[in-house]
Amino acid sequence: MPTHIEPVRRTQFGMGISVFTPAPKPLNEFSRSRAAAEWARDIIADLPRLKRISDEAKAIFDVRWAGISAVVDDWQHVIASSGGMLGLYRRSTALSSYVVAYPYQPFCIANALQDERFHGNPFVEDGLIGFYAGVAIFDAAGLAVGVLCVTHPQPLEIIAPDALELLTSLARSVTPPVLPRSPVPE
């Protein structure tokens, strides 16, 4: 798998270069990404409910951060979170990009510091992510349009057996039943 070199960035020791392995893009990336952009545009109106889902995911895992994001093109857009930042992040550095690459099972990294795919990843190297668990959010067409994930700065070796099932159930609750959309003016 090819590695990725991030541009020079400031570290506590001066300037550095990050080398790590980004997730591959799915074969259906073009249609998946377009669907994710539409989903994000539509779901943003339901921010209070998304925040409650993030809060619940954070509580289930007893972690520092939980969030709901859309992965569109080369960006991860964190739409709702509990305990952290919202905004845009480079897809190449986002662990959630692995969820959209392999969407049919929960993606869990108990110790990101020991996983060679993430050696050099700035979120891991800077101590922001030691543990990660994420589940895909699907649209009505079955495309992985978003991610519900939880992170913690320290690795978590012991995870409740049903925690990933609960995270999956919460991810399914993010996108409500599809309602007919009104036509978009051209």
Regions found by a protein language model. Give the residues of each.
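Intrinsically disordered, low-complexity terminal regulatory regions
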Residues: 2-94, 162, 166-186
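Short hydrophobic/aromatic beta-strand element in the GNAT-like acyltransferase core
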Residues: 65, 134, 147
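Regulatory sensory and allosteric helical modules in signal-transduction proteins
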Residues: 71, 75-77, 86-130
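A cytosolic small-molecule/anion-sensing beta-strand core signal
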Residues: 72, 139, 146
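Residue-level signal for well-ordered alpha-helical scaffold segments within enzymatic catalytic domains
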Residues: 98-102, 140, 169
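A short, aliphatic-rich beta-strand micro-motif
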Residues: 130-139
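Flexible loop/coil segments at beta-strand boundaries within sensory signal-transduction domains
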Residues: 138-143, 153
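Short beta-strand-to-loop transition segments that serve as allosteric relay/switch motifs
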Residues: 148-157
